[in-house]
């Protein structure tokens, strides 16, 4: 007899990460191509030497470092194994069975997964024609069962960020009882000036989610954080799985904050490359939404899978999203040039239905 598991899991699609294979240029997972700084590598080595010891489940030193870095109280900081784990914890902390979690679509693929695993109901609101959050439609979709709203800004995978005024108007329209999570995983690449922490200080229902996986280059160690009202942080601590943020990750994150100036200076190069790649794609005839992150997006619709497969054959791995589009991570200049060589080829333009110029 087959062991019994939850029957509703058959209807839940598991999160699918970006693919990789030896020798390929991987522009599929929004990773930075630069490794940790020497000081961070030293912290990693020191922590690894004590791998026989359990990590600090209270994340005391890391929380203190985050609080000091951003000028908030330690009671306002929660830590998780990447910001995606905090997304899941937020659903568990806010929702009972049948409660609603709202988010735009297409947005971060983990949102529907963590929602349904918790027994909550995902409510999706389509993006606008320019691949941005339709905040008016989202505000109008709030019901008595809405408990949590994820707002990914810059939006993954489409790229645009929301302005402060847009978010203020949205937050003013959403009931205070609804938790609004501003998922700012790509905050460090956003040059618009919008900072979720400014909104956290004015709206007690705002949670700011950030990560050390992207600009800080610690994707392999899995550490992220939430800044929120103390009551929300206390609730997160009750649904947190013990010891999931390991000692190496905590030490690396503390060292990364200490070196944040040098690490964040790297993002200027990524932003410059992002703009260069987008301009080249626009010049080649592609539709490319504005991006405030470390990637660009091609809304190729039903051609997305074929485009991604052809790029992989050319040695460049991208991230297709069903029949919606393809996301391209900004890599090193040489990696970006390899992608552009493919994207401007006759084959790629034919697949994408982009006119081949004489």
UniProtKB/Swiss-Prot annotation:
List N6-(pyridoxal phosphate)lysine occurrences by residue: 214
Q: Which GO terms describe its molecular function?
A: aromatic-amino-acid transaminase activity; histidinol-phosphate transaminase activity; pyridoxal phosphate binding
InterPro entries from the entry? Aminotrans_II_pyridoxalP_BS (IPR001917), Aminotransferase_I/II_large (IPR004839), ArAT (IPR024892), HisP_aminotrans (IPR005861), HistidinolP_aminotransfase (IPR050106), PyrdxlP-dep_Trfase (IPR015424), PyrdxlP-dep_Trfase_major (IPR015421), PyrdxlP-dep_Trfase_small (IPR015422)
Cofactors, names only: pyridoxal 5'-phosphate
Query: Can the keyword Transferase be found in this entry's annotation?
Result: yes
Identify the EC number(s). 2.6.1.57
User: What are the UniProt keywords, alphabetically?
Assistant: Aminotransferase, Pyridoxal phosphate, Transferase
Broad EC category: transferase
Q: Which CDD domains match?
A: AAT_like
Q: Which SUPFAM superfamilies match?
A: PLP-dependent transferases
How would you summarize the oligomeric state and partners of this protein? Homodimer.
Q: Could you tell me what this protein is called? A: Aromatic amino acid aminotransferase
What is the species listed in this Swiss-Prot or TrEMBL entry? Rhodococcus opacus (strain B4)
> Species lineage, top-down?
Bacteria, Bacillati, Actinomycetota, Actinomycetes, Mycobacteriales
